[in-house]
């Protein structure tokens, strides 16, 4: 189909740099693009935030546009983020080796993770970061490359149950000491619902327009200086230190009103998942008119699948197109009892995590209070 061919033509243009594509919760693959806010342009999906002063620094380009799915996690769950140089995985690689720098992960509690325009602004707290590991002489991005593009963190065990945005941030410093400085931030957000937890309310910062300054030592840092000026001053606030969950009594009324996830769940009847889109079985039919009517409903869904696909790929849409072709073949051959393979789940088995889930050694040195 034309849309499929067009997507393949555009894909090579998105080779540059990196982007977060896939969330794993406790080592379970949620699906490419599922629950992930990302740049929806395949040509620029792996590009850094420009300009640095943009509010896109919160969740990336198109980061104020929510997706329909929210991935469930638990307090203390292991979140693993996969980064790719090619969003659809057409070629291997996570980020160019020259793009050396720190990594950080933030969270923000929101009323509704499926709502637009809730990324930039107050409410963010950092749950993990690491910069330059003097024991291995490697930057976080170098460790990321060594680990096939996988980066893992733990959800704090004591934060409140509810909806959260989880913000990943990679900073490439290869041009940060240029004149003018050109630090490259790669930012995306995942939508999750944290189950369990406690009542902790971490101190937060506002991330948006003007959050980072080119005058910040960690932003304009010279990675080529010998010896390096260490310790490296990681940009942003200090990491929130989880205190664990205290035992506390909960009255029946509180239990009845406790928040439960009711948004962003996988729809019932979904037989094919493509990032945040689902394909649904077409109506039964027993005559020629019904057969072609169901064929049309299948192709209507196919059209939406191709038109709304994230840069992570259209392979699921190709699977759906095969289903529609099968219905057409049945209609043309006079087989008017269907649909064929009714209700068969077509979503491929998700790939296994291909890297270590060990959390990279965190930089725990104390710095002076950070200012942007």
From Swiss-Prot:
Its cofactor is Cu(2+). Cu(2+) binds at residues 17, 99, 186. It catalyses: [(1->4)-beta-D-glucosyl]n+m + reduced acceptor + O2 = 4-dehydro-beta-D-glucosyl-[(1->4)-beta-D-glucosyl]n-1 + [(1->4)-beta-D-glucosyl]m + acceptor + H2O. One of its GO terms (biological process) is cellulose catabolic process. The keyword Metal-binding applies. Lytic polysaccharide monooxygenase (LPMO) that depolymerizes crystalline and amorphous polysaccharides via the oxidation of scissile alpha- or beta-(1-4)-glycosidic bonds, yielding C1 or C4 oxidation products. Catalysis by LPMOs requires the reduction of the active-site copper from Cu(II) to Cu(I) by a reducing agent and H(2)O(2) or O(2) as a cosubstrate. It is an enzyme of class 1 (oxidoreductase). Its main location: secreted. This is AA9 family lytic polysaccharide monooxygenase C. It comes from the Eukaryota. Its EC number is 1.14.99.56. Binds 1 copper ion per subunit. One of its GO terms (cellular component) is extracellular region. It is found in: Secreted. Pfam families: AA9. PANTHER family: ENDO-BETA-1,4-GLUCANASE D, PUTATIVE (AFU_ORTHOLOGUE AFUA_1G12560)-RELATED. Induction: Expression is up-regulated on steam-exploded bagasse as carbon source compared to glucose. The lineage of its organism: Eukaryota, Fungi, Dikarya, Ascomycota, Pezizomycotina. The keyword Oxidoreductase applies. Belongs to the polysaccharide monooxygenase AA9 family. Keywords: Carbohydrate metabolism, Cellulose degradation, Copper, Disulfide bond, Metal-binding, Monooxygenase, Oxidoreductase, Polysaccharide degradation, Secreted, Signal.
